[in-house]
């Protein structure tokens, strides 16, 4: 049976809705679904992920090297864990777009970016030319790295599941980057990638 690993989007405290959309995309692909939570002091996130219906288990990589989810470190972890999976799915958010191309390169596969529909386990639809054309892409890679446009998939429920949580001991520090700071712009409007209506 095919196995898919979904990469959780979170801030070490709360699980982001984009994760539920990514799980929905994984369900469309089919097979068993596990979730990887990489962070520091992120136990609450792992428990929230375990409550998602349809998830078999949650892999929790709780280590200081993942505190700020630096793409260089997280990509090494994902590529390591992904050895046991057929597909790796992540939301096409800022974090996903930063990390997943590195994962695809480490796994030596072509990434399927910004998918908006799943036709079959190896065939996906994605927008090109600023959304004016919808391309149907079939992957011949044995393992697939996929980012999904969150607004194209209705999120799965937050409650109802009872997945087990397993600790992942691997701590990958690439030593290539360091966290300097973060400036968060506060807005009462949703993020563009999560907005149900966009007016331009």
Segments from the language model and where they lie:
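N-terminal glycine-rich FAD/FM-binding segment characteristic of electron-transfer flavoproteins
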Residues: 1-200
